[in-house]
């Protein structure tokens, strides 16, 4: 085992600091579903039960793990600190696999274009999917404990049941050559699965979990399929390279992990999911690339130049504002003004409010208001289990004496990548009375039925 000396301590300490600033400042505009992922853990920290109190379409490993970082405070700063810690661990395994080539990999990860590689650094289940897969690849390359690999495969399945479940199939590679390895992995796999089963059983959320995470998949893939031509071409090119690698090196199990990991791009073949695939793709390519020169200094300079250039190019007309639980939030000045106007109006009216905006914006408002997360806050196709659209329409139809805030831009949005349930907005517009318009926000009042 590598001795963890003074220089290593400084190196990983600096990586931790950089990762925190990258999350909080450098790449914040690439945050994607940050508020939703944070919101899952925030809700657990608030004492809510996943699948019962709010909808969640992944198994609970990632939200529960990240909620541990919120043990002492619900602030997003602690969420960033927790992710910076995980990214530091991630970098440790990258160094173990790539040695000096790790710095080249970090330069690739810091790039915000042409694929937004930096977006995969943000906390959430997709990052954990990548992180756990990297650890397993390291263990495979070094013939480490099959029990440990099995436990991590179980955690992968509990992180994202679709991709994680497929990654477990890589162990079939050993089925005929060494079936005892497979049995050990199955034994390890069952440990986290059993713990999760007991958690769901005792929290009375087992059926809801099955409905949302498995039966809802039929709606999700059918309703949400979308591809961007540029990223589809990028993915196809990389996939052809992968197939060539498998043909040339059929005994390299890392190729099969990458092949199965490629399923992460479905059903949304766009910048984020293709970048997630590329994060593992470039790691495996670099592992086979012969390069012994020390490029750490040049790489560090390049990473810092990229980071600061990105900051100066993207942060024009933006402000830093501190909301409750969402300190150091960076938004365009116009958006901050809209938020303040909406808050003032709703506070003056003093009515129950449901935000039926994009999921990330619903979570933003709920978290900054220190409110509980509900089933209305992630109104996307495939997020409500079997016949999910009918379920959420039924919930909306039963509302009374409440303000519902919707986004006018979603009403006529023809963007095929948009997962928002427009049938829900149609019902709100039909049933409610428009009482106020604040920029893009439309506020409807749904009265008490006689």
Task: Report the location of each language-model feature.
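Transmembrane-helix motifs of polytopic, lipid-linked glycan transferases
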Residues: 81-102, 242-246
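Aromatic- and kink-enriched transmembrane "portal" helix at the membrane-lumen/periplasm boundary
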Residues: 63, 76, 106-130, 158, ...
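Short periplasmic/luminal acceptor-recognition loop of GT-C membrane glycosyltransferases, typified by
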Residues: 57, 317-323, 329-383, 391-414, ...
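Extracytoplasmic catalytic/substrate-binding loops of multi-pass membrane glycan-assembly enzymes
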Residues: 26-40, 53-68, 334
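Membrane-interface alpha helices of multi-pass inner-membrane proteins
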Residues: 146-161, 166-172, 191, 258-268
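Hydrophobic alpha-helical membrane-interfacial segments at the cytosolic entry of transmembrane helices
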Residues: 12-19, 178-201, 237-238, 297-308
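Loop-to-helix entry region of an early transmembrane alpha helix in multi-pass inner-membrane enzymes
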Residues: 56, 60, 64, 72-89
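Membrane-interface transmembrane helices that cradle and orient dolichyl/undecaprenyl
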Residues: 128, 132-148, 240-251, 289
């Amino acid at each position: 085992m590598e001795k963890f000396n003074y220089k290593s301590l400084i190196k990983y300490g600096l990586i931790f600091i950089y990762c925190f600033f990258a999350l909080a400042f450098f790449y914040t505009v690439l945050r994607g579903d940050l508020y939703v992922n944070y919101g899952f853990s925030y809700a657990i920290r608030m004492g809510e039960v996943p699948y019962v109190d709010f909808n969640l379409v992944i198994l609970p490993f990632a939200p529960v793990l990240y909620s541990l970082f919120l043990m002492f405070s619900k602030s997003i700063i602690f969420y960033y600190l927790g992710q910076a810690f995980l990214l530091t661990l991630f970098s440790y395994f990258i160094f173990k696999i790539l040695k000096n080539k790790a710095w080249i990999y970090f330069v690739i990860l810091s790039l915000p274009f042409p694929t937004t590689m930096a977006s995969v650094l943000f906390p959430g289940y997709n990052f954990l999917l990548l992180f756990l897969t990297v650890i397993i690849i390291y263990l495979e390359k070094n013939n480490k404990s099959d029990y440990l690999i099995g436990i991590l495969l179980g955690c992968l399945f509990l992180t994202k049941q679709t991709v994680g479940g497929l990654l477990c199939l890589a162990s079939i590679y050993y089925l005929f050559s060494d079936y005892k390895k497979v049995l050990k992995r199955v034994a390890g796999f069952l440990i986290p699965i059993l713990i999760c089963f007991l958690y769901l059983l005792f929290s009375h959320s087992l059926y809801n979990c099955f409905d949302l995470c498995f039966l809802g998949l039929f709606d999700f893939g059918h309703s949400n399929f979308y591809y961007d031509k540029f990223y589809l071409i990028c993915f196809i090119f990389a996939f052809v390279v992968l197939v060539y690698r498998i043909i040339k090196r059929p005994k390299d199990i890392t190729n099969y992990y990458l092949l199965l990991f490629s399923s992460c791009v479905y059903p949304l073949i766009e910048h984020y999911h293709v970048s997630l695939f590329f994060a593992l793709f470039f790691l495996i390519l670099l592992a086979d690339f012969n390069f012994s020169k020390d490029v750490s200094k040049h790489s560090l300079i390049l990473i810092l130049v990229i980071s600061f250039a990105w900051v100066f190019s993207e942060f024009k007309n933006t402000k830093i504002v501190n909301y409750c639980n969402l300190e150091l939030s960076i938004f365009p000045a116009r958006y901050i003004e809209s938020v303040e106007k909406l808050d003032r109006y709703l506070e003056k009216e003093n009515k129950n409010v449901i935000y039926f905006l994009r999921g990330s914006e619903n979570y933003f408002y709920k978290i900054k208001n220190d409110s509980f997360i509900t089933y209305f806050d992630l109104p996307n196709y495939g997020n409500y289990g079997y016949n999910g659209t009918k379920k959420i329409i039924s919930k909306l139809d039963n509302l009374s004496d409440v303000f519902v805030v919707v986004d006018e831009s979603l009403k006529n949005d023809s963007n095929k990548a948009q997962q928002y349930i427009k049938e829900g907005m149609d019902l709100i517009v039909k049933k409610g009375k428009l009482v106020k318009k604040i920029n893009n926000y439309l506020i409807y009042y749904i009265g008490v039925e006689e």
